Structures are given as C-alpha cells and as structure tokens.
Amino acid sequence: MLTQGSIVEAIPHAQLPLRYEALPSFEGQHAIALRRLIWLYFWLLIFEGALRKWIVPSLSTPLLVVRDPLVILIYLQALRCRRFPINGPMLGCFLLLVGFILLALVQITTGVGGGVLVAAYGLRTNFLHLPLIFVIPQVFSYADVLKLGKWILILAIPMTALMVLQFESSAGSWMNAATRSDVQQIEFAMGKVRPSGTFSFATGAAHFFVLATAFMVYALAQKRMIYPRWLVWSALLSVLIVQPVSGSRLLVLGCGLVVAGTIAFGMINLGRAQKILGVLVLIGLVFGALSFTGFFREASDVFMTRWNDASDAAGGVQQGIVWRFFGGFFEPFTLLPQAGLIGKGIGMGTNAASAMMTGALVFLLAEGEWARVVLEAGPLLGFSFLFYRVWVAGTVGVRAWSSAKQGKLLAWLLAWDACRSLVTEQISQPTNLGFMVFVGGLCLAALAEDRFSNRIASEPSSRHPVHNLGKGPDSRRRFRGSPLPVS
C-alpha cells in the first residue's frame, strides 16, 4: 500500500510536486518538534537566570531545574523519531548510571550521605543532561549550528550593554540582584560587582562569551561573509569590551583559548594562514583602539587589580592560575583517605545539598570538580565517571583535530571550550552543566561542515548564505537520512 511517506522516499527529491514538499513525513514532523525543543533548551539556558533574579524571584528554587523536564521530553521525542543514539558513549553513560544508582542505594541503607533527595539530585547532576551531547548532533545540521551562532552573536550585543550597566551599578542595585534575597553578586575589585548578564552567576556569562568568541572568529575567518557585516563587527566590539568588564578570569582565559586555537589552525592550514593572521591583526587593532577610551582603561585597571589580588592571595600566578587548573587533577588523590570505599554520599558536593542540609550555599565536600566526584562516590565509581568524561572529551578533541586538518574551523574552535568543560567543569552548578552539554553537542554537530560547504558552493552566490539556511532541500531530507555518527 502506497503512503505519502513511501512516495516521498521513492521519487527523487528534486522531482517531488510542491504539495509533497510542504507536507513533511510523520517522522519528519517529530524531528522538527525535537529540534524546536532543543532550541527551547538553549533559550532557557540563556534566560533562566533572568527569570530567577528579576521576573519571578519567588520561584527561584524550582526554576533551578527548569530544564530538567525539558531534557526528559527531548529524550522521549528523540526515541520517538529514532534520533536517540545507541553507541559506545551512550552505553558507557548508562552503565555508569546503573553503578551510581546501586551505590546510592548502598549509601542510603548504611546511613551515608544526605538521604534520598540529595542522592537523587546528585544522580540528576551527573547523568540527566549528559546524553544531550550525543542527541544534538542527531538533530542539528551544520546549518542549524550556524543559525544558533547567529543568535549568539545577536545576543552578545545587548548582553554586553547589560553587563556594562551592571559593572557601573552598585552591589545593591536591582540590576545586580542574585537568585536569593539573602545574598549578593560577588564584588571583584575596587567596589565593582562581577556582572552576570542574564545569568544567575558570572560563570554563565563567561561560557556565553567564549561561545560568542568562537562564532565571531569563525565568521571573520571565512572567505564569504556568512553573517551580516554589521553583526560580526558589533559582536567583535562586544566580545572585546566585555573582557575587562566581566572581572572573570574564566571568561578571559576561555576566549584566549579560542584565539590560541585560531593560531594553531593557521599553523596547520598554511593556505589559510594569511586570513587567520588578518583576523588576529584586526582583533589587536580594535582592542588597541578601545584601550584609548576612558571607560575601557578604567575597566582594565579594575580587572588587573582583581587579577593581581587573586594571584597574590594564591601565592602568585603559578599558584593562582597554573596550580588552580592542574592541581584539581591531583586533589582527589590526596583526599582518598577521607572518601573511603563508598564515598560520603552522592549529591553531597552540590550546592543544592548544602542548601537542603545547612540552609546556606557552602562547599560541604570540596570546591574542585574532581575532588567532589571522588568524595561523593568513592574511588572506584568516582574515577570511572571522571575517566568517562575525559574519554568523551578526547573523542571530541580528536575528531575536531581531524576536522581542522581538513581546513574546517568551527568544530575546532568549539572543541577548545567543549573539551575543557568536559574534563574540569563544576557541573553541580546548573548553568555550567547546561553549557557543557550544549557546546559539546554543537561541536559534534559542526563536524558535518563538509556537506554544508559543498551545498553552498553549488548554490548561486549570496552575500549572507546563513540567511537561507534550512530552506533548501537538504534541510528537509536531513531527518530521513542516517544520523550523524558520534563515536
């Protein structure tokens, strides 16, 4: 029996009547809905902090996990339209989840940890959002990644303006409100508050602008302008202005890693080295021009004061920067005697556990991510979970490196933040967790650049190819093809 779906698959796409082009298949309809759910996840990631701080502060606590039911819905929809991958990384995640559930039961029955709610929140922190890394590339095409990049560059402009206003405002201003009425945003130097933008904390703004830097550099390095020129230039100004204003070493170092990745790309693709050099010179010139303005000099002075104070407090740059990063890998080994065989309780190292058990936001176990995981779950499962994250990061990094050697830039730029986050990110903070999985998924989706480049090369010239993304036949056929491999 012939159905619309069988006709669509049987007839070459270019010969389909218009009525079939306008009516996606049943599977395609679910895939489109799935893509919209992922977009909703992105928008909540950007604006959930604004909801918690300004719009509905009375619901700040439940909004902390507002993306949790959404990510479950994404998984159910992915299963429904056969976009939930069953591969090595996903099976590894499932086996670890089973192990952690069994460990949580042992801890609860032996009186270790904070009880059922704390253990459930710990399992949610470690595993609920992690599979999204592998679902996104099954749904997002390279065109979708560029669309999202355009929105990130658009958002970077008002986000910078908001952070400048927060920088200039007092700690008690409504613009610098925190997600709890009894706390304030952190002051970083000379009475200035570390601005958080629309996010609940400054780390969210840091992740956002590292992502914006990757898309901005990618756009500048292309032979053809993929975004409007005004947008790219405005994003460049925004990214540079926010560096000293942020007061965040994570933001500055993260953007620096993207620039380092750009330099490395030019070194392994000598044919594009001249273009890459031009991008770096342009960034340097704009930065130099900004340094002549009074506001930028003031913000830079405040940031350097914060940098020097933090370095001095930690024993110098070596202790404050280098050891803070690499020391986190050795800390869990020194804490093994405290962890014991089964750990101190899954979820005990999260902010939610400290709020439930003490009523305050304190580190009950450790501040570092590796130490938190090992102290919560003990050495066996703790190091297994950390090794899994390192393995996923290594897989993403190797594939991005292979893409870079073929002259494909975007996945390579995204990988620098994705891999760092997978290895070291403090995922007990929901915004950090959201950016870790989302950037990782975007990086894997960006590996499909070859197909997109071939399609653009075969189409008539356009000033901004991104304007037509998702409108051609490839965007409709995307959901009927095989999922992108991720392992």
Where are these regions (language model features)?
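Loop-to-helix entry and N-terminal half of a specific, functionally important transmembrane alpha helix
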Residues: 36-46, 394-426
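Alpha-helical transmembrane segments of multi-pass inner-membrane proteins
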Residues: 150-173, 177, 187-190, 197-247, ...
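A membrane-periplasm/extracellular boundary helix in multi-pass inner-membrane enzymes
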Residues: 2-4, 161, 167-171, 263-315, ...
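Membrane-interfacial entry segments at the cytosolic side of transmembrane helices
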Residues: 144-152, 226-232, 268-282
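Transmembrane alpha-helices of multi-pass inner-membrane enzymes
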Residues: 72-75, 412-421, 426-470
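Long extracytoplasmic/lumenal interhelical loops at the membrane interface
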Residues: 55, 301, 308-377, 396-401
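N-terminal hydrophobic segments of proteins, predominantly signal-anchor/transmembrane helices
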Residues: 33-54, 68-127
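Interfacial loop-to-transmembrane-helix boundary motif in multi-pass membrane proteins
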Residues: 34-38, 42-43, 89-100, 135-171
